């Protein structure tokens, strides 16, 4: 290589590396614009607490490297600010320095605990493509100025406290792909301008208070794939929905839609999830032009007014996995053609009018729920393919002995045969299952309740109430550590109190009422336990003995309320939501609880032979709603610590041997709407609280020393203390009267005795004999 060639070669190399070094160095030295940096720092200072996750925000570092900040590679302008889940704990100011970032394309402040209103100046960020403000505590109306953000692709304002109507200006967002306004308090109708969003893929308006009709312009949104408006008050849909060729999810549940079943909807082959439950659709179920390529997997039509029979055409949905049409008026048999639905796993037709045989192909599903129908028999099982896990056949017309073919359903987890006419014994084959629920109540089963729970370690619910079972209570239940519901009511079980159940940490409901249980509830050798107990009913048995003062002190679930995720005590079995039910005397009336509230706490020890003092530890059960100790032999005073029972609604202490006064502080219990103190030995004034004055007179009968009942009984039950002397005063007066009477009676005799004694001692006895001797002889004779 010549010298000139070398010279040019080195020049080229030098220039190349100079450009390379400059290009690598310049972003770190000159990338962040000062105005952008200063704007971000001022935005940070608007919040009392602002902690970035990793890279702190300060002037000494490049703002483009700050946590959550992204800049344009060329201009250095901030184009993205992602602070999701950063606790800002304040509101967005109208003049916030955030709005100086005019080149922002992406803004995510979701889950930041923002409150206050959305400032209208947000509409000045005209380059925004994604706006995420969901899961905060924002209030007020959606600002009209958001319609200025014409580059917006994603608008997410869900899970806030926004009010007012959806602004019509949202129709200006013609590029919008995703509109998310769920879980707010929006009202009014959807504006017709929403039909301008021709590119929209997802619309989520669920969990608001929107009403009226879905506008006809809605049919313009032909690219829509997800449509969710459940939990609103919409009343009508456009008549033709067949143009949504890309629709996958259609959820309009829990609204006020009425009219005929929208059959043309099901001609859309892409449709996979349809939920129309909890509306007022009526008439028969019909499907128009079902595509052979239909992708429908989930169809939920529960709680409508649908009638007629199950259509044969439903068997064309070969991809169907879940079918739930419960709580309608569907009648007739289950079509045999439905056996073609080989993908079906969940079949729910509870609370209808189906009848005939239960087809055997249902046993290959995972869940079959046919309660509250009129089925009377079972088709013979020909297939060995049994995958059933949840089987609910309650409230039908089955009769005869326990179906032995159930013993072959090896995968069975939950079995409900309650409220039928089954008889005979409960089979031992049930020990081979690992059941989570066994519900056999209200049949005619007899014999013993077999000890079959040694291997059923997952058992959560056991209900054999309302049968004719006898013998011992099964001790193998001690193995069921997850047991939370036990109901053996109205049988003939004869055993001592199963105090060993107190060691089960999850036990919430224990109902032993109306059996032949006997003996004491408390054994000094055993710990009391029952830390998770919420409801106990052991009434109408033969329990006896004394309860120690601390008997209830370990019942933690009645002391402190732990809010659960659900409103009712329930089981979730493969999609199926199964509520627990029971019967109990509440406010003096036998009640049936089809669902048990999570916050309900009750103790019923009535109609037994328990005696001694009422344990003071009851006063610690601050979550207690119902307390019934009637029909026992409790003595002494009513504990005075009960003013802590501020949630108590029902109190029945009738037919005991209680004495003393009714504690005046009970009159302060504002929720106490029913009480019964009758047939005791109570005395003193009735509390003057409003709740006491609203009670019936019979609630205080046969307590002869109670007073202050004039307003309750509308007559003077016992005179008031102003007109009636106290018992102590009466006793003193009676003693004084007795002394006076004695003095009057014995005074003359004593006087005569003294006189006669003086005569004898004064040697005047001859005179005495002369005057009174014959009378003395007469008296002596008479004495004989």
Curated annotation (Swiss-Prot):
It comes from the Eukaryota. It is a single-pass type I membrane protein. It is found in: Cell membrane. InterPro entries: Leu-rich_rpt, Leu-rich_rpt_typical-subtyp, LRR_dom_sf, LRR_N_plant-typ, LRR_R13L4/SHOC2-like, RLP23-like. Keywords: Cell membrane, Glycoprotein, Leucine-rich repeat, Membrane, Receptor, Repeat, Signal, Transmembrane, Transmembrane helix. Its main location: membrane. The keyword Transmembrane helix applies. LRR repeats lie at residues 101-125, 126-151, 153-173, 174-197, 198-220, 222-244, 245-268, 270-292, 293-317, 319-341, 342-365, 367-384, 385-409, 410-435, 437-455, 456-480, 482-503, 504-528, 530-554, 597-621, 622-644, 645-669, 671-694. Residues 1-25 form the signal peptide. The keyword Zinc does not apply. GO terms for biological process: meristem maintenance. Gene3D superfamilies: Ribonuclease Inhibitor (3.80.10.10). Glycans are attached at residues 58, 89, 95, 124, 154, 172, 183, 220, 233, 289, 329, 423, 434, 455, 574, 628, 644, 676. Residues 26-739 are extracellular. SUPFAM superfamilies: L domain-like. The chain crosses the membrane at residues 740-760. Residues 761-784 are cytoplasmic. Involved in the perception of CLV3 and CLV3-like peptides, that act as extracellular signals regulating meristems maintenance. Belongs to the RLP family. This is Receptor-like protein 11. The lineage of its organism: Eukaryota, Viridiplantae, Streptophyta, Embryophyta, Tracheophyta.
């Amino acid at each position: 290589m010549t010298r000139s060639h070398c010279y040019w070669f080195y020049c080229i190399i030098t220039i190349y590396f100079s450009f390379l070094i400059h290009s690598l160095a310049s972003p770190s030295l000159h990338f962040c614009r000062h105005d952008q940096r200063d704007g971000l720092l001022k935005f940070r200072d608007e919040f009392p607490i602002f902690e970035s996750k990793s890279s702190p925000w300060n002037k000494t570092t490049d703002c483009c490297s700050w946590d959550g900040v992204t800049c344009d590679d060329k201009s250095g302008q901030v184009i993205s600010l992602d602070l999701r889940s950063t606790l800002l704990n304040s509101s967005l100011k109208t003049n916030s320095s955030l709005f100086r970032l005019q080149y922002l394309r992406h803004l995510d402040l979701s889950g930041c605990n923002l409150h206050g209103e959305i400032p209208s100046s947000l509409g000045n960020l005209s380059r925004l493509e994604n706006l995420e403000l969901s899961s905060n505590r924002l209030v007020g109306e959606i600002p009209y100025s958001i319609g200025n953000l014409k580059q917006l692709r994603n608008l997410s304002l869900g899970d806030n406290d926004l009010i007012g109507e959806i602004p019509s200006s949202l129709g200006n967002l013609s590029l919008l792909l995703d509109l998310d306004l769920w879980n707010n308090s929006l009202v009014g109708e959807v504006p017709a301008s929403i039909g301008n969003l021709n590119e929209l893929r997802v619309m989520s308006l669920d969990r608001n208070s929107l009403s009226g009709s879905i506008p006809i312009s809605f049919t313009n949104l032909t690219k829509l794939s997800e449509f969710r408006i459940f939990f609103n008050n919409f009343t009508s849909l456009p008549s033709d929905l067949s143009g949504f060729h890309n629709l996958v999810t259609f959820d309009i549940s829990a609204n006020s839609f009425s009219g005929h079943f929208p059959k043309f909807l099901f001609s859309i082959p892409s449709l996979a999830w349809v939920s129309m439950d909890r509306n007022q659709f009526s008439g028969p179920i019909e499907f128009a032009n079902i595509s052979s390529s239909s992708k429908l997997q989930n169809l939920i039509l529960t709680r409508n007014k649908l009638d007629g029979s199950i259509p044969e055409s439903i068997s064309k949905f070969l991809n169907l996995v879940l079918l739930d049409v419960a709580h309608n008026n569907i009648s007739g048999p289950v079509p045999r053609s439905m056996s073609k639905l080989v993908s079906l796993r969940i079949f729910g037709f509870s609370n209808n009018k189906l009848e005939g045989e239960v087809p055997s192909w249902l046993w290959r599903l995972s869940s079959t729920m046919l309660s509250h129908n009129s089925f009377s028999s079972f088709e013979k099982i020909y297939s060995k393919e049994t995958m059933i896990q949840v089987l609910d056949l309650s409230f039908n017309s089955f009769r005869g002995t326990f179906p032995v073919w159930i013993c072959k359903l090896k995968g069975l987890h939950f079995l409900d045969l309650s409220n039928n006419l089954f008889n005979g014994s409960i089979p031992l084959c049930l020990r081979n299952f690992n059941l989570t629920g066994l519900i056999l109540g209200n049949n005619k089963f007899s014999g013993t309740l077999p000890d079959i729970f040694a291997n059923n370690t997952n058992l959560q619910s056991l209900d054999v109430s309302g049968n004719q079972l006898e013998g011992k209570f099964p001790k193998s239940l001690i193995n069921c550590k997850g047991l939370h519901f036990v109901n053996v009511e109205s049988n003939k079980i004869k055993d001592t109190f199963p105090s060993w159940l107190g060691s089960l940490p999850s036990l919430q409901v224990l109902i032993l009422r109306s059996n032949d249980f006997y003996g004491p509830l408390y054994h000094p050798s055993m710990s009391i336990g029952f830390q998770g107990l919420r409801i106990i009913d052991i009434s109408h048995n033969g329990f006896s003995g004394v309860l120690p003062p601390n008997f209830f002190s370990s019942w933690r679930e009645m002391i402190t309320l732990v809010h659960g995720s659900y409103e009712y005590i329930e089981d979730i079995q493969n999609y199926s939501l199964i509520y627990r039910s029971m019967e109990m005397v509440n406010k003096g009336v036998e009640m049936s609880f089809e669902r048990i509230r999570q916050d309900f706490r009750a103790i019923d020890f009535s109609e037994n032979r328990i005696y001694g003092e009422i344990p003071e530890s009851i006063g610690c059960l601050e979550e207690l709603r119902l307390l019934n100790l009637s029909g026992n032999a409790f003595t002494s005073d009513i504990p005075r610590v009960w003013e802590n029972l501020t949630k108590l609604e029902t109190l029945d202490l009738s037919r005991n041997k209680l004495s003393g006064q009714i504690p005046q502080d009970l009159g302060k219990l504002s929720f106490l709407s029913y009480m019964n103190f009758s047939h005791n030995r109570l005395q003193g004034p009735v509390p003057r609280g409003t709740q006491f004055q609203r009670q019936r007179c019979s609630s205080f009968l046969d307590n002869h020393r109670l007073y202050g009942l004039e307003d309750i009984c509308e007559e003077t039950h016992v005179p008031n203390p102003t007109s009636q002397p106290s018992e102590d005063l009466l006793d003193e007066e009676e003693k004084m009267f007795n002394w006076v009477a004695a003095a009057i009676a014995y005074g003359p005799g004593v006087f005569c005795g003294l006189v006669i004694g003086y005569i004898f001692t004064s040697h005047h006895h001859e005179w005495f004999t002369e005057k009174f001797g014959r009378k003395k002889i007469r008296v002596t004779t008479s004495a004989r």
